[in-house]
C-alpha cells in the first residue's frame, strides 16, 4: 500500500488522522500517520492489514446490500447513524471501526442513488 492508497482509504471511511492513529494504528501517534500519508515512512504491515480487512468488509457489505436491493420492490432505505452512540443503540456489539464501515457503505449506496438514508 502506498501513501495515496492510505489517504484514499482514510477518506473512504471518513476518518480523521487522529481517529486512524487511535483506531487503526492503535498508537494514538498522529504524526506517524501523517508521515505515512506523506510517503516519508513505510506504512507498518499491521496497519496495511487492518485497512485491507476494513476494505474487504466494506466490499462484502456493499455486495450483500446491492443483492438485496436487486431482489426487492419498494422503498430502499438504510439507517444513517450520526454518531457511534446512535450506532451502538442498534448494534450494541459494534465498535468505532464497525460504525465507520457501516457509514461508508451507507454513503456509497446513497451516492449512487441506490438507497435513501433515514
UniProtKB/Swiss-Prot annotation:
<dbReference type="InterPro" id="IPR015060">
    <property type="entry name" value="Aca2_YdiL-like"/>
</dbReference>
<protein>
    <recommendedName>
        <fullName>Uncharacterized protein YdiL</fullName>
    </recommendedName>
</protein>
<dbReference type="InterPro" id="IPR027910">
    <property type="entry name" value="YdiL_sf"/>
</dbReference>
<dbReference type="Pfam" id="PF08965">
    <property type="entry name" value="Aca2_YdiL"/>
</dbReference>
<dbReference type="InterPro" id="IPR010982">
    <property type="entry name" value="Lambda_DNA-bd_dom_sf"/>
</dbReference>
<dbReference type="GO" id="GO:0003677">
    <property type="term" value="F:DNA binding"/>
</dbReference>
